């Protein structure tokens, strides 16, 4: 049996069309466009590439994009001042701080300056707390994208055993909580887990978020399981692979996200959806 491929590019296209329609409706109703401010420190080519992708996405959908690139010698105080000013600026609905920051800058203190209502990356402790309590807040985009792939493909989650391999604050932990909120039985595994293969093999849904290429192999996966791969690993030969050994798992699983073209494309649309949601909530709270 060969797994169904959970195609992130196709889903991202559908989501973008839905989001464009929702954004245009917002603009017509409110007379303004949702707006995103990206804050980053100059000098990181990967950060520049990511920013270009976000800018293009905003333009396609109708979101106003502003780029706040700070010089390499930026101090903690300057960074916090920039974020704080954007938090107070009523014309800005979403703030995205590009992480990781260069050495010498404290990301936790910088993130604390983001108004939680504008935290479109879902990284502020306030939004993490809402997620842990099962209350709606702004959700981190990577796990939100993975959930969207599962839900839109009608993958049953209720009562299913999901093993999340990886406990990062940005992907593993929030993904485990999102699955829990959908009534899955969730196990979190990580680098210290004893007999990882056995823990993974017991799962109906396997989520890989470790940053270790090819960690999850076909012999670790229960036949018919659904596999979500958040890994983005660039090999020495330039190939991009996930945390799942696709070639061996594709013959065992019932459904699998490819890398590239799986969770990645959906993640970027989730960011833009958060910008619209943040704008909607901010305008609604002003009207009360």
Swiss-Prot record:
Q: What is its EC number?
A: 1.5.1.5, 3.5.4.9
A single Gene Ontology biological process assigned to it is: tetrahydrofolate interconversion
Q: Name one GO cellular component term.
A: cytosol
Q: Which InterPro entries match?
A: Aminoacid_DH-like_N_sf, NAD(P)-bd_dom_sf, THF_DH/CycHdrlase, THF_DH/CycHdrlase_cat_dom, THF_DH/CycHdrlase_NAD-bd_dom
Reaction(s) the record says it catalyses: (6R)-5,10-methylene-5,6,7,8-tetrahydrofolate + NADP(+) = (6R)-5,10-methenyltetrahydrofolate + NADPH; (6R)-5,10-methenyltetrahydrofolate + H2O = (6R)-10-formyltetrahydrofolate + H(+)
Detail which positions bind NADP(+): 166-168, 191, 232
Protein origin, superkingdom = Bacteria
Q: Under which pathway is this protein filed?
A: One-carbon metabolism; tetrahydrofolate interconversion
Sorted alphabetically, which Pfam families does this protein's record hold?
THF_DHG_CYH, THF_DHG_CYH_C
Q: Name one GO molecular function term.
A: methenyltetrahydrofolate cyclohydrolase activity
Q: Which UniProt keywords apply?
A: Amino-acid biosynthesis, Histidine biosynthesis, Hydrolase, Methionine biosynthesis, Multifunctional enzyme, NADP, One-carbon metabolism, Oxidoreductase, Purine biosynthesis
Role played: Catalyzes the oxidation of 5,10-methylenetetrahydrofolate to 5,10-methenyltetrahydrofolate and then the hydrolysis of 5,10-methenyltetrahydrofolate to 10-formyltetrahydrofolate.
Q: How does it assemble?
A: Homodimer.
Write down the HAMAP family for this protein, in alphabetical order: THF_DHG_CYH
Q: Which family does it belong to?
A: Belongs to the tetrahydrofolate dehydrogenase/cyclohydrolase family.
The protein depicted here goes by the name Bifunctional protein FolD
Q: Which organism is it from?
A: Roseiflexus sp. (strain RS-1)
Whichever gene encodes this chain, its name is folD
């Amino acid at each position: 049996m060969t797994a169904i491929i959970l195609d992130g590019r196709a889903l991202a296209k559908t989501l973008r069309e839905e989001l464009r329609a929702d954004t245009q409706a917002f603009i017509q109703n409110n007379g303004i466009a949702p707006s995103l401010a990206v804050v980053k420190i100059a000098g990181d080519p990967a950060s520049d590439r990511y920013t270009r992708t976000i800018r293009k996405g905003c333009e396609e959908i109708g979101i106003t994009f502003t780029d706040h690139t700070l010089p390499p010698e930026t101090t903690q105080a300057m960074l916090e001042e920039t974020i704080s000013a954007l938090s107070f600026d009523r014309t800005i609905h979403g703030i995205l701080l590009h992480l990781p920051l260069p050495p010498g800058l404290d990301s936790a203190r910088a993130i604390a300056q983001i108004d939680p209502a504008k935290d479109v990356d879902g990284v502020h402790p306030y939004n993490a707390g809402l997620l842990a309590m099962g209350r709606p807040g702004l959700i981190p985009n990577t796990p939100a994208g993975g959930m969207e792939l599962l839900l839109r493909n009608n993958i049953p989650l209720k009562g299913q055993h999901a093993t999340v391999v990886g406990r990062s604050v940005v992907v593993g932990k929030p993904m485990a909580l999102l699955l829990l909120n959908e009534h899955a039985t969730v196990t979190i595994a990580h680098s210290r887990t004893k007999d990882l293969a056995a823990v993974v093999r017991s799962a109906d849904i396997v989520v890989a978020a470790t940053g270790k290429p090819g960690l999850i192999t076909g012999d670790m996966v229960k036949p018919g399981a659904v596999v979500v791969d958040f890994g983005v690993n660039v090999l020495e030969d330039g190939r991009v692979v996930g945390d799942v050994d696709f070639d061996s798992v594709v013959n065992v699983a019932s459904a699998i996200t490819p890398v590239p073209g799986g969770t990645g494309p959906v993640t970027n649309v989730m960011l833009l959806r958060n910008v619209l949601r943040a704008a909607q909530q901010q305008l609604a709270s002003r009207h009360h």
